[in-house]
């Protein structure tokens, strides 16, 4: 339907509603007041039109309950890429400072194999861990950096191991495979100093997607695999979407939602590559022989489907793949140092890495 026609239909509906309007019906203010009936239905195409009352569950912490109970606007004002990046950089700095107050560390900006990196060294790094390193591939939608600090500082502190956060090239200026190439270059350079069994690669959101892509690329190149992978809120399939992308926004059941359309995920990142390319979408590749991998997601995560589908593909390929799903929380919630669940998630991640590194 074109814009003019949609506008005319909207006006017609508006006039019709005004002519027939009665006194407004009070909306329920609590789950207990909501009608005890289900108005969901399945249309002729098989799509579900869902109406549900979902209370804030008692299974999560009080701070998490407050977060879930806070509504976010359905409409997001247009934002330039430059504004998004500056806003994300400001958020990353604030959140990183908050984590640093809890987890003292030293952060150094450097380059490895010509790629910018942030090296996060935890306070009190033991001598026994100086021959080990964790590689973080940050989130941020492939077009900004929302996690090089929030994903590195707590993990470095809890694992007591240095983290190298890779500041890979961003889309749309540098589409796939630029981020993969940068990450592989850093890994290859670190192999000159560290044994592969003393290296872990991990990431959250787009960084988790990138982690799976890098693992696929390492296998393709015949390079030695790291000791473990951490894939936290991800997808491994740019050609298809699961349920969660239609159900949840970044903020779960609140906030702006862009249901998936017929086009592939993130065309600015994909560029002209086939969405089923086995490095871009590792779910279509040969996953046999990949290292032990931890998957983490949550039940209101927009990438819940992507995470569990990739986890199942790893299992089917014989990979030692573990999955942790947190109840009710939203996409990549572990960035927030105020949530007890964030502390729990980061400890689970760090403990998994430490055990795979032989400590």
Model feature map: region roles:
Residues 1-10:
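Bacterial N-terminal signal peptides that target proteins for export
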Residues 14-16:
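Short, linear, compositionally biased motifs with a strong N-terminal bias
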Residues 6, 84-85, 118, 169:
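Basic side chains
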Residues 19, 23-43, 51-78, 97-359:
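Alpha/beta-hydrolase superfamily serine-hydrolase fold, recognizing
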Residues 76-93:
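Phosphate-/polyanion-interacting regions in eukaryotic proteins
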